[in-house]
Amino acid sequence: MRVWYRVRDLDAARVFYTEVLGFAESFVDEDERWAALDRGATEIAIGEGEPEPEEEGLVATIDVEDVKAERERLDKAQVQVGTVLELHGAMRLVDVFDPDGNRIQLAQELP
C-alpha cells in the first residue's frame, strides 16, 4: 500500500523526505509533478497540489531503531514533531509533520 500526500512545492518536499526522513526516490514525474519514495517497507507518493493534512485516517509509518533519538534529531533540525507515546510497553510512536502539515509516524517495537 502506498500513502499519497499533497504538497505545495514538490521540489522542497522531495528534499525533506529524502534528506531529512531518509526516503529514496523510486520514481519522479516532472511533467505531472509527483514522486514515489520508499524507506524499507514504507512507500509513499507526493504530488503537487493543495495539501489536505488530516489528524486521523491513513498515515505512513516508518519503523526506526530508536524513536526517542529520531525525535531529538528531527527536533534539532526544526522539524515539527509530537510527543513520544508508549503503547502497552510494546511500541513507541511519534508523529512527525512535513512542511505542509502532512503527518508521518515513526514506530519502534520494544523488546
Give the predicted meaning of each segment:
Residues 9-10, 65-67:
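Helix N-cap motif at beta-to-alpha junctions
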Residues 22-28, 80-84:
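Short secondary-structure junctions
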Residues 16, 68-73:
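Short amphipathic alpha-helices within nucleic acid-binding modules
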Residues 1-12, 41, 58-60, 110-111:
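N-terminal beta-strand motif that seeds the catalytic metal site of vicinal oxygen chelate
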Residues 24-58, 103-109:
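Conserved short beta-strand elements that form part of the metal-binding/catalytic scaffold
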Residues 1, 32-33, 58, 70, ...:
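Residue-level marker for the onset of beta-strands and adjacent loop->beta junctions
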Residues 11-24:
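Amphipathic alpha-helical segments
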Residues 71, 75-111:
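Vicinal oxygen chelate
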